[in-house]
Amino acid sequence: MLKVGWKASAEQFGPRELVDHTVRAEQLGFDSVFISDHFQPWRHRAGHAPFAMSWLAAAGERTERVTLGTSVMTPTFRYNPAVVAQAFGTLGALNPGRIILGIGTGEALNEVAVGAAGSPWPEFKERFARLREAVTLMRRLWTEERVTFEGDYYRTHDATIYDRPAEPIPVYVAAGGPLVARYAGRSGDGFICTSGKGRELYADQLLPAVDEGLSRSSRTRDDIDRMIEIKLSYDRDPGAALHNVRFWAPLSLTAEQKHGVHDPVEMERLADELSDEQVAKRWIVTSDPGEAVEQIRQYVDLGFNHLVVHAPGDDQARFLDQFSADVLPGLRGL
């Protein structure tokens, strides 16, 4: 069954506003809400960066049904994975069956400012090794009573998570390339990526790598949630749909451009040098509900079963109402 969620854009809005929109999303029939976890936003001016774990607790208390998770959190530098396991154990105990931990290898923007990672920013090999070790430790803490762990990066001695749900928290692994996607298939409860990067990336690299990982662990596609953040700027006003994407210009920077940038002022400067055409190409920009559905359909046809819609505009209430009335019924029919 296709699931449709809403992305709570923590880099753009404050915590109270995001909670209120989450309540509205649940009322309108969305299945999930995922929040980003940034220490610093993509933009210095008008940016926000609420603490995701506190926010999830508040959102959980204001909602009843919707699944809540991170997309994504880095449990390896500014957080100790044992503390992340404790926090998500508490969230899972408060909201049984509704909490997901989405994780990634991290960005300099969020880790260097607090001294959690050195300069230069660690290369991918170390970041990926930390991620795998963190997942192993967190899962042991969620399932075992006394955990002594001696890893390359993290250690515990007779550690116990006393408040946790009956079932371990699902771990969704975000990947932008086949190596981590393969790991997601082998070890993840879910796989996360973002839209707008060319069909070949998903069809020829990411999803085949997930399938390879599944095969190596004797699992099938039914054993993993295949989630994609859909970058959708939908508005009944075509001009507004195009204008709204400008705030999110940093997403159109290449990985090479963003690598090692730890200052939101510098990130904003780089993003503002991009043309409107460069910014818009990452997004589905439309005022036509049918076109929105058809553009999104390509990801469903590729095998994604969980769509989390990220809308760029500053009026999220307007988007939620228009999208749920105009586009969501068509997606439910896919």
From Swiss-Prot:
The active site is at H38, E107. It comes from Intrasporangium calvum (strain ATCC 23552 / DSM 43043 / JCM 3097 / NBRC 12989 / NCIMB 10167 / NRRL B-3866 / 7 KIP). Catalyzes the coenzyme F420-dependent oxidation of glucose 6-phosphate (G6P) to 6-phosphogluconolactone. It catalyses: oxidized coenzyme F420-(gamma-L-Glu)(n) + D-glucose 6-phosphate + H(+) = 6-phospho-D-glucono-1,5-lactone + reduced coenzyme F420-(gamma-L-Glu)(n). GO terms for molecular function: coenzyme F420 binding; glucose-6-phosphate dehydrogenase (coenzyme F420) activity; oxidoreductase activity, acting on paired donors, with incorporation or reduction of molecular oxygen. This is F420-dependent glucose-6-phosphate dehydrogenase. Pfam families: Bac_luciferase. Coenzyme F420-(gamma-Glu)n binds at D37, T74, T105, G106, N110, G176, G177, L179, V180. Homodimer. Keywords: Carbohydrate metabolism, Oxidoreductase. Its EC number is 1.1.98.2. The lineage of its organism: Bacteria, Bacillati, Actinomycetota, Actinomycetes, Micrococcales. InterPro entries: F420-dep_G6P_DH, F420-G6PD/mer, F420_G6P_DH-rel, Luciferase-like_dom, Luciferase-like_sf. The keyword Oxidoreductase applies. Substrate binds at T194, K197, K258, R282. One of its GO terms (biological process) is carbohydrate metabolic process. Belongs to the F420-dependent glucose-6-phosphate dehydrogenase family. The keyword Lyase does not apply.
